[in-house]
Each structure stands twice: as structure tokens, then as C-alpha cells.
Amino acid sequence: MGIMNGKTVIITGAGRAVLSDGVSCGSIGYGIATAFAKEEANLVITGRNVKKLEDAKEELERLYGVKVLPVQADVSAGSDNKAVVQNVVDATIKAFGRIDALINNAQASASGVTLADHSTEQFDLAVYSGLYAA
């Protein structure tokens, strides 16, 4: 029995993609979810892309036999962020009755842009999502 058996973990930014050739392309959040799945935790995975969340759910359940709840959630939602987070909490409690750990992994950023090249708005979004979304 895994050390997280019966525990519930929320992991933000935990989607995964399957490439056209069938190869899995994970994320840091997906890697974290895999580690908790190996320890038999119930998982709540969040992200912006429903397809990536469904791919992650399917693979984690198939490989590790754990329960996975994918919840679409954009932690960069700005003023709506409280509602987004509350939806994740409510869905988790409804599905599993408890929350034992939160891994605040997701962060909005401008992909492929160096920090020096971020606009003020891009920088603010990265800071907001990284510090306040949890």
C-alpha cells in the first residue's frame, strides 16, 4: 500500500499531451501527479486544456489504478480567480470528501519569451498566477 493511499492531492498545471505518433509529452505537473499516483493518492489535476487533462487522467488511471478528477481551471483568471479556485475545491470535496495536499505548480507565462522581453502585462500575469493563485 502506498503512503498516500486514501489521501487526496490537488495538482495545478498537470495536463499531458499525446503527440501524433502516440508518444506522451508530459509536464512538470504531470510528473508530480505520476509520483503521487505511484503512492496511490486520489488526484485532482487542473489546467486550461481539457484534452491534456483527459489524456493525463486516462494514462494515470490505466497505469496506476488511481482515481483522477480532471478540472479545467485557469489560475491566471485575474479577478475571477477566487471563483476558479473555489470551483476546484468544491469539485474535490464532492468527489473525494477531503483535501490533503495542494501542489501549486501552474503558472501563466509568455511561452518562448525571455524575462527581459516580457511586457508589463505579461510580467504581472506571471507574478499573479505564481503567487496568488494558490
Please state what every model-predicted region is.
Residues G2-V44:
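Canonical Rossmann dinucleotide-binding motif of NAD(H)/NADP(H)-dependent dehydrogenases/reductases
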Residues T8, D100-A101, D124:
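Conserved catalytic-site loops of classical short-chain dehydrogenases/reductases
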Residues E39-D55:
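Conserved glycine-rich Rossmann-like NAD(P)H-binding loop of the short-chain dehydrogenase/reductase
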Residues E61-D80:
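Rossmann-fold cofactor-recognition segment
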Residues A77-K94:
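Conserved Rossmann-fold cofactor-binding substructure of NAD(P)-dependent oxidoreductases
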Residues N105-S111:
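Conserved NAD(P)H cofactor-binding loop of Rossmann-fold oxidoreductase domains
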Residues V113-L115, S119-D124:
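Substrate-binding pocket helix/loop in short-chain dehydrogenase/reductase
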Residues L131-Y132:
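Ankyrin-repeat alpha-helix packing hotspot
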